[in-house]
C-alpha cells in the first residue's frame, strides 16, 4: 500500500487533496492526527479578503458555524489564521453534495431519485432549516450543491 504525501501540513492537520474549489476558497480533505479523523478544510487566502465587508462576512460565518449545533448541520471543528490564509476546519461529509449525487444517480439508473428517497432527504433538511430559523439564521444560498451527504461507513 502506497502512503500519500500530504499537500501541506498545519499543526496536527495533514492536507491530503483538494475536494472543492470556489471563487474565494479551496476545500481540502485533511487528516486531523490529534483526533484521528478526516476533516474538510475551507482555505481562504487573506488576499481574497481585501474589503472590510469580506472580513465582516468571514467573521459572521464563523459566528454562525460556532453557534449552530444540530446533527444535520455541518459542524465546525477549528479555525486557524496564518499570515496568508484563514482555515475553517469542518466535519467531513463523505458523500459529496446532493447535486453530484443526483447527476450520478440519473446517469447510472436513467431516472431521477424516487419519491421515498427524496422524502428521506427532506426529513433531514427541513429540521436543520427550522433550527437555523429558530436561531434567527437565514441560509440565503440553499441549493443542491450546498447540501452535503454523509453515508454511514
Model-assigned labels for residue ranges:
Residues 133-149:
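Catalytic-loop of the protein kinase fold
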Residues 31-39:
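Conserved N-lobe loop of protein kinases adjacent to the ATP-binding glycine-rich P-loop
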Residues 58, 62-63:
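Regulatory alphaC helix of protein kinase catalytic domains
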Residues 99-112:
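AlphaC helix of the protein kinase catalytic domain
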Residues 78-79:
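A short, aromatic-enriched beta-strand patch in the conserved N-lobe beta-sheet
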Residues 84-97, 101:
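Conserved short submotifs of the Hanks-type protein kinase catalytic core
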Residues 26:
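Conserved N-lobe ATP-binding subsite of Hanks-type protein kinase domains
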Residues 121-122:
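Activation segment signature within eukaryotic-like protein kinase domains
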Amino acid at each position: 500500500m502506497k502512503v500519500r504525501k500530504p499537500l501541506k501540513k498545519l499543526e496536527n492537520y495533514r492536507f491530503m487533496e483538494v475536494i472543492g474549489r470556489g471563487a474565494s476558497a479551496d476545500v481540502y480533505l485533511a487528516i486531523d492526527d490529534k483526533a484521528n479523523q478526516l476533516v474538510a478544510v475551507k482555505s481562504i487566502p487573506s488576499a481574497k479578503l481585501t474589503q472590510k465587508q469580506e472580513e465582516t462576512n468571514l467573521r459572521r460565518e464563523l459566528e454562525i458555524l460556532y453557534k449552530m449545533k444540530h446533527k444535520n448541520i455541518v459542524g465546525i471543528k477549528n479555525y486557524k489564521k496564518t499570515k496568508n490564509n484563514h482555515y475553517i476546519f469542518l466535519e467531513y461529509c463523505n458523500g459529496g453534495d446532493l447535486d453530484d449525487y443526483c447527476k450520478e444517480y440519473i446517469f447510472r439508473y436513467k431516472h431521477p431519485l424516487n419519491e421515498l428517497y427524496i422524502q428521506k432527504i427532506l426529513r433531514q433538511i427541513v429540521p436543520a432549516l427550522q433550527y437555523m430559523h429558530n436561531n434567527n439564521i437565514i441560509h440565503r444560498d440553499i441549493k443542491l450543491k450546498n447540501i452535503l451527504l454523509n453515508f454511514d461507513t
